[in-house]
Regions:
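Active-site-proximal beta-strand elements of phosphoester/diester hydrolases
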Residues: 1-10, 93-102, 129-133, 186-191
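Divalent metal-coordination and catalytic microenvironments
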Residues: 8, 31, 36, 63, ...
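Conserved acidic residues
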Residues: 29-31, 57, 126-129, 165
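Binuclear metal-dependent phosphoesterase catalytic core
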Residues: 18, 88-92, 109-110, 153-165, ...
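Conserved catalytic scaffold of divalent metal-dependent phosphoesterases
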Residues: 66-154
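Core catalytic region of metal-dependent phosphoesterases/phosphodiesterases
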Residues: 6, 11-91, 190-193
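Short, solvent-exposed loop/turn segments at secondary-structure junctions
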Residues: 40-41, 138-140, 176
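Short, conserved loop/helix-junction motifs that constitute active-site signature segments
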Residues: 50-55, 122-124, 159-162, 182
Length: 199
């Protein structure tokens, strides 16, 4: 499966144009958005409309610049957007699990609780793709400067325990476009213009 993931667009027309160009030049099966498509919900409806007009299935979560309720409502009223915050989606033998918002705490008790419920949804042989706005702690995705990590420890614990094939996150703009392997997982901050990844 070929995925084009993106995060932290923050209303940028240039970023949306680059995503559209990548869709035109690559055979993409799925779009994934890890949140913050706006600056505090400015121009929300228009941005969601543009994403919908890409005409490809798009799994999306809210970031810290959007409310869960508004993102869910706009996705439900679109043709191609699927809101996956705490609502996993199965595509073939892949299961996509999203958890939006946050990005400012080391711990997320609600994520711990919900991720346990998610694991009861998973079947033997499923390949898990995790989509969060907050990056996992102590990785190349949450480093602000040398030896200073600001990510979420509960998300990191989940990744270490479950070994998803891919974990997409955003929030930390300084680490946009960073991709690397952590054990069995591809960790990715896809940046606002997007990164193509094959799983």
């Amino acid at each position: 499966m070929k995925i084009l993931a993106f995060s932290d667009v923050h209303g940028s027309e240039k970023a949306l144009k680059r995503i559209k160009q990548k869709l035109a030049h690559e055979k993409i099966d799925l779009l994934i958005c890890a949140g913050d498509i706006t600056i505090f919900e400015q121009g929300y409806v228009g941005i969601v409309r543009k994403l919908d007009e890409f005409g490809i299935k798009t799994l999306i979560i809210h970031g810290n610049h959007e409310s869960r309720e508004t993102m869910k409502r706009l996705a439900e009223n679109s043709k191609n957007l699927i809101f996956i915050h705490k609502d996993p989606v199965r595509i073939g033998d892949y299961v996509f699990y999203g958890y939006g918002g946050g990005g400012f705490s080391f711990r997320e008790p609600d994520f711990v609780k919900d991720s346990k419920k998610f694991l009861s949804f998973v079947k033997r042989g499923d390949k898990i793709v995790l989509v969060t706005h907050a990056p996992p702690y102590n990785t190349k995705l949450d480093m602000l400067w040398e030896d200073h990590h600001c990510g979420n420890k509960d998300i990191k614990t989940f990744i270490d325990k479950v070994n998803p094939v891919l974990a997409v996150s955003g929030h930390i703009h300084e680490n946009a476009y960073v991709t690397y392997h952590h054990k069995k997982t591809i960790l990715l901050n896809p940046g606002p213009t997007g990164t193509v990844v094959k799983i």
